[in-house]
From Swiss-Prot:
<dbReference type="InterPro" id="IPR036770">
    <property type="entry name" value="Ankyrin_rpt-contain_sf"/>
</dbReference>
<feature type="binding site">
    <location>
        <begin position="120"/>
        <end position="124"/>
    </location>
    <ligand>
        <name>an acyl-CoA</name>
    </ligand>
</feature>
<dbReference type="InterPro" id="IPR002110">
    <property type="entry name" value="Ankyrin_rpt"/>
</dbReference>
<feature type="region of interest" description="Disordered">
    <location>
        <begin position="179"/>
        <end position="202"/>
    </location>
</feature>
<comment type="function">
    <text>Binds medium- and long-chain acyl-CoA esters with high affinity. Can interact in vitro with palmitoyl-CoA, linoleoyl-CoA and linolenoyl-CoA. Binds phosphatidic acid (PA) and phosphatidylcholine (PC) in vitro. May play a role in the biosynthesis of phospholipids.</text>
</comment>
<feature type="glycosylation site" description="N-linked (GlcNAc...) asparagine">
    <location>
        <position position="216"/>
    </location>
</feature>
<feature type="transmembrane region" description="Helical; Signal-anchor">
    <location>
        <begin position="12"/>
        <end position="32"/>
    </location>
</feature>
<keyword id="KW-0256">Endoplasmic reticulum</keyword>
<dbReference type="Pfam" id="PF00887">
    <property type="entry name" value="ACBP"/>
</dbReference>
<keyword id="KW-0446">Lipid-binding</keyword>
<feature type="repeat" description="ANK 1">
    <location>
        <begin position="251"/>
        <end position="280"/>
    </location>
</feature>
<feature type="region of interest" description="Disordered">
    <location>
        <begin position="40"/>
        <end position="88"/>
    </location>
</feature>
<dbReference type="InterPro" id="IPR035984">
    <property type="entry name" value="Acyl-CoA-binding_sf"/>
</dbReference>
<dbReference type="InterPro" id="IPR000582">
    <property type="entry name" value="Acyl-CoA-binding_protein"/>
</dbReference>
<keyword id="KW-0472">Membrane</keyword>
<feature type="domain" description="ACB">
    <location>
        <begin position="90"/>
        <end position="178"/>
    </location>
</feature>
<feature type="repeat" description="ANK 2">
    <location>
        <begin position="284"/>
        <end position="313"/>
    </location>
</feature>
Amino acid sequence: MGGDWQELAQAAVIGLLFAFLVAKLISTVIAFKEDNLRITRSTPTSPSAADTPAAPAPPPASLDGGHGDTSDGSGSDSDSDWEGVESTELDEEFSAASAFVAASAASGTSVPEQAQLQLYGLYKIATEGPCTAPQPSALKLKARAKWNAWHKLGAMPTEEAMQKYITVVDELFPNWSMGSSTKRKDEDTTVSASSSKGPMGPVFSSLMYEEEDQGNDSELGDIHVSAREGAIDDIAKHLAAGVEVNMRDSEGRTPLHWAVDRGHLNSVEILVNANADVNAQDNEGQTALHYAVLCEREDIAELLVKHHADVQIKDEDGNTVRELCPSSWSFMNLAN
């Protein structure tokens, strides 16, 4: 009898647990459905409201009491506007100055060469910027002088170069601005003399735009070309064939000048051993030793000195090799 009651009690407990679990499951399902229904039935945003663009926000009040809109941006940008005006005026004055100089050159006005070089360097900085061109050969004296005038100005600002250019023109021609092309009266006549030379006119055509002779082979003897190229076998053949070792080109340069300028030490040795005149001067009065110093070829200079090159010979500018050479070249102090 007691065993029956225990079985009945166990069955009742199990039934209650089962009923509790079922009820819990049902309540969970119902709650989940209610949540879904709540989400689905939530009121959407009105399409008309969503599609209507928001009115633009009113501009903030200006700090000057509401008068900001009447300034047309002239308040904060006034400095940059003035800079633009100043830059334009400087450009025009520089253009007028360079055009005036071009016209002066065309009319044959004489200007010191040093001033020409100064104008050239400033013009190149103003129109092209810092010098990046390779240094010309020492054989090209004018080209070398122009390159130095440009190169020594370094990274000078364009505006500064323009202003200095104008200052030099003012010093050379105090009254040039009286007929300046900044007034745009006779500009067409002035610019026509220079328009084919550059965007703002040349400095002095005789210096700035002179085409330098680059050693045209048609103007050189075969031995000059061989010395220039460092072709030692060809040099030996020319000498063996009886070619004059001191043969001059149109500029008075000997094969030794060419070999030194191009830095061909072996060619220099062959020529000096063939009794080349180490003191021969070109049309500018420069010897092969001048070339060695100007081109900073110390080993060749020392070789020439050993072959009794004269360090006291002056070129047309009155410069001796000893005056031009670096102080570190001690062998120069022992020469002659």
